[in-house]
Amino acid sequence: MVRKDYNHPCVVLYSTGNEIPEIGCPSGHEMNKKLVDALHQLDSTRYVTNAVSGFLAVAYHMEKHVENQRQEYDKAMNDAQGSEKMNAMASDVEKQMMDAFACSPLLNESILPIEEAVDVAGYNYLNARHTYIHKAHPEWVVVGSETYPTEIAELWNIVENNSHVIGDFTWTGYDYLGEAGIGIFHYDPTRLESGYQGWFPDRLAYCGDINLNGYRRPVSYLREIAYGLRTKPYLFARRVDKAGQRHDKNRWKYHDGVHSWTYPGYEGTETTVYVLTKDPEAELFLNGVSLGRKKVGEVEALTAVFEVPYQPGTLTVRTTSGEDSIVTAGEAVGLHAEASKTVLEKGGRDVCFITADLVDSEGHTNRFAVRRIQAVLEGEAVLAGFGSANPSCEGSYTDTAWDTFDGRVMAAVRSGMQPGKAELKLIMNGTVAAIIPIEVR
């Protein structure tokens, strides 16, 4: 690993591990030190960290003192999903208790040898420790090696106001297959206490800032605003068709909302509208009529919260830094397709991605409608994959027909071995709704 990418500009840190089960026991301390020394010997120009799970670290000590937990602990340590279970436990603990735990003598005892061995102390879901440890060890450097996406406002404030904290890694930037269900909103009344647990047919984690089709979810805009990279506000609404329904919760789940105001059949249903901004106040308008002003931060950091009865039209927010709007779309009658590129290099190794969104007759995106889309590829290219970002569904990404999710599907097209022409056709309701020409050269 080190020799392969030695001195590569994108490599800033090496890690001796992430959520290692034995991190809090003597053998784990010893192995970590050996790995740190080996990495320093192989590459003295880069720093080394270890992403520590607090619950895994103290489990060794808790097991020594609490005999009746031994079998459950051993099972978790031997289970392939041991770290996932410990993360679920951490997610369920009240934040105040979690912060107290992050600064506890028990955790100090468990991970001090790890912290002393590495160049940068990496903490998973231990926000309070980022600043706490600086008092005892002002020379240490800290990174948030894994953190909840919902807590980025707090975390980035820590980064900006503490020079020893060099940054933050969220779990996670891009959605992924596996750990199915940790970020999915389960509305089934029998599953409200599931928290972390996934249920068939859950397939994705669904905790990414960006979904599987490359579409930015609302929490990504919260992050962009927290970073200071976006000044204008961002507006989104809780799915109106889910308004009033309870779902399971954990801190990987932000809000089940979309940048959309299209919910035919739900007129009059009250839903929650969120405005993300660093400005002190936001004013909301529906079809030009003011719905009032709200202070930012009263309910959530960097957020103004409104309760709004759904009516079709235009929902607009205005702050001192700008405005944002969402417009009700009409019936989904077509597709708007875009390709990441349309010229591929021959040899079977080049790929382009085509996204297709449902649109009405005026070109407005319809995120509510569901349509079956078929992908047909002809010519000197291969349909490498096709599907939606639906986190809970059946089907394979090798299938050529998928239902849209939040109004979108995506295709991955790989170049053929020889130069030539190719064409991707997307068919909806039995009619070709979009054609993407591709050149392989």
Segments from the language model and where they lie:
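Active-site groove signature of glycoside hydrolases
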Residues: V2-P26, S110-P113
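Short, solvent-exposed loop/turn segments enriched in Ser/Thr/Gly
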Residues: G348-I354, G420
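Short beta-strand elements
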Residues: G322-E331, T431-R441
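Short, hydrophobic beta-strand segments
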Residues: V305-Y310, T398-M417
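Short aromatic-acidic-glycine turn motif
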Residues: K294, G334-H336, V376-S392
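Beta-strand signatures of extracellular beta-sandwich domains
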Residues: E281-F285, R372-V376, K425
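Substrate-binding clefts and catalytic carboxylate motifs of secreted carbohydrate-active enzymes
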Residues: Y14, D37-Q41, V48-R349, S361-N366
